[in-house]
Amino acid sequence: MASAKIFLIFLLAALIATPAAFAILVPTLVSTHISGLVFCSVNGNLDVINGLSPQVFPNASVQLRCGATNVISSTITNGSGAFSLAVNTFPLLNCNLVVATPLSTCNATLQSVGRLASSLRLVNITLGSGTGLIRVGLAPTGFILNLNIN
C-alpha cells in the first residue's frame, strides 16, 4: 500500500513538472522580419533599352497586406530603396508586399496606375536558445507592376 502511495506521489509530481519543462522547450513567440529593396521599374529587371540596372525607389511606402486589402504593417524605403518590417503575426497567410506609392513618383515616364507587388519567400529561420523565440526571415520574390492594385 505504501509503495502505491509513493508511486502516486511521483506520478503527480511528474505530471505537474511536465508542463513547466515543456513550456521552456516550446517557442512562445514568433518574430517575422521582412526586408528587401524596391527598384523604380515595372519588373525590377535590367532596362531592356539601355541595359542598365533600374534605379532604386527611395521614400516609397511599402505595405504588408494579408487578404485583399488588410494592411498588417507598413514602412518607408530609405534613400537606397531598402526597407525592413518586423511583425509578430504568424502565420502570414495570403500575404504580399505592396508599394503603395505610385511608380510614377520615382520616374514620371512610368505608369501612375497600379502598384508594385511581390509575394514573399522564406530566407531563414532562427531558433533562440533558451528564449523560446523563433525568428523567421522573409524577403520579396520580386516587385512587379500589378495594374489591378491601387
Curated annotation (Swiss-Prot):
List the GO biological process terms.
defense response
PANTHER family (UniProt xref): POLLEN OLE E 1 ALLERGEN AND EXTENSIN FAMILY PROTEIN, POLLEN OLE E 1 ALLERGEN AND EXTENSIN FAMILY PROTEIN-RELATED
**InterPro entries noted in UniProt:** Phylloplanin-like
Q: Which GO CC annotations does the UniProt entry carry?
A: extracellular region
Name of the protein in its database record: Phylloplanin
Localisation: Secreted
Q: Which domain of life is it from?
A: Eukaryota
| Signal peptide residue numbers | 1-23
PTM note: Probably covalently linked to cuticular lipids and/or trichome exudate diterpens or sugar esters in order to increase the solubility in exudate and the dispersion on the leaf surface.
The question of whether Translocase is a record keyword is answered with no
Summary of the function given for this chain in its UniProt record? Inhibits spore germination and leaf infection by fungal pathogens.
Q: In which tissues is it expressed?
A: Expressed in small glandular secreting trichomes (SGTs).
Keywords tagged on the record: Plant defense, Secreted, Signal
